[in-house]
Amino acid sequence: RMGYAPSKPCKPLFIDDSASAYLHLLYQNNERAPHIDGLALAYAHTKVLEVPDRPIRPEILRPLLAACRNGLRLEIEYVSLNTPNVEIRLIAPHTLVYSGMRWHVRAYCEKNRQYRDFVLSRLRGNPDLLDASENTRELDEDWNTEVPIIFTPDSRLNAAQQCIIETDFGMTGGKLVVSSRKALVKYVLARYQVDPRNQATNPEAQQIVVSNIKELRPWLMHD
């Protein structure tokens, strides 16, 4: 197979020359690689674990996007684990969010009179677009306010093990500080596989903990 080999002075123009940038590019283009000439070789020794898609109908997504873009209210049919029977909700959505495992929409809920997350795969029927809403993204305090999440190695690990964990997660001074919107704190913890309710009995399995968990508890309520 013909191709180009970079010389030592060669510098990439569209990404930086870090390993993380290249690996991120591999991840982003994994699904397209078999269909694009020239990418197949780069991906021949790469395997990305994909999360199965949750079924979301276009008839649900289209009005959601329109409501987000135009600041409109939306009438939806929704089910949840607490309310398994279909319930009519009036919401004012403003942002679609992918947590790494599922899609949800951040929206003002007129029933509960607060901003909440609605899982897209739990919407039923066809949403109806209504009039403009006064409850916009600008009024969603938990969305517009960021807090630091401080990860540290599990203190039950010995010094050598903690040093390995610090390197694994790119920690500085023994901690990794991740800034997050308040509304997304619980999803960030899930991405780092930290369950704030249950600590693993094996510190080698736990690996990292959140040192400022008390300050974050107001935003750890689960749906």
Set out the residue ranges of the language-model regions:
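Core beta-strand-centered patch of the WYL/Sm-like small regulatory domain
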Residues: Y43-A160, I164-E166
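Short, charged low-complexity intrinsically disordered segments located at boundaries
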Residues: P12-S20, R54-I56, P93-Y98, K214-D223
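Short N-terminal signal/transit or membrane-insertion segments
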Residues: H24-H45, V97-V105, L157-A159, M171-T172, ...
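Bulky hydrophobic/aromatic content
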Residues: P6-V79, R191, N198-N202, V209
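Polybasic (Lys/Arg-rich)
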Residues: N144-D223
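Basic, Lys/Arg-rich alpha-helical nucleic-acid-recognition elements, primarily the DNA-binding modules
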Residues: R1
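Short, solvent-exposed polar/charged micro-motifs at secondary-structure junctions
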Residues: P6-P9, P84-R89, S211-L220
